[in-house]
């Protein structure tokens, strides 16, 4: 293991419109090739669309939707005596959020709406209702962990 000091996590600046760190972090997940202004317009467009449809505070809606997508457990591969076991592990809070955001963006990208903002809005609305590809991904991960519960004594 490295003997250097542990590097402190960088402070993420809140987004300009809602002054929310979570939305700023989500923008960074949506961003491709460093084009933050495009990612910003996509996320704000999606949140406006959600606000039009549901008549709710977009930040609050986003937070609750993200909470529904966050995984509690996941499986990690662990080699024991030549065999590889899928060992269920609890997910630490920062990784839960990162996975949920990644799954939302990936699920939105695979949708068929015309613009990414519409796809993202659709995926957020679906996730809030407990359906959609991001929720399915979470359930698949939980199912894998449940199926491999027998190997939980191999924890790291």
From Swiss-Prot:
Top-level taxon in the UniProt lineage: Bacteria
Keyword Lipid biosynthesis: no
Transmembrane intervals: none
Gene3D superfamilies: Ribosomal protein S7 domain
SUPFAM superfamilies documented for this protein: Ribosomal protein S7
GO cellular component: small ribosomal subunit
Keywords assigned: Ribonucleoprotein, Ribosomal protein, RNA-binding, rRNA-binding, tRNA-binding
GO molecular function, one term: tRNA binding
GO biological process, alphabetically ordered: translation
Classification via InterPro entries: Ribosomal_uS7, Ribosomal_uS7_bac/org-type, Ribosomal_uS7_CS, Ribosomal_uS7_dom, Ribosomal_uS7_dom_sf
Similarity comment text for this entry: Belongs to the universal ribosomal protein uS7 family.
HAMAP family membership: Ribosomal_uS7_B
Subunit structure: Part of the 30S ribosomal subunit. Contacts proteins S9 and S11.
Record's function text: One of the primary rRNA binding proteins, it binds directly to 16S rRNA where it nucleates assembly of the head domain of the 30S subunit. Is located at the subunit interface close to the decoding center, probably blocks exit of the E-site tRNA.
Full protein name: Small ribosomal subunit protein uS7
Biological source species: Acinetobacter baumannii (strain AB0057)
Native organism taxonomy: Bacteria, Pseudomonadati, Pseudomonadota, Gammaproteobacteria, Moraxellales
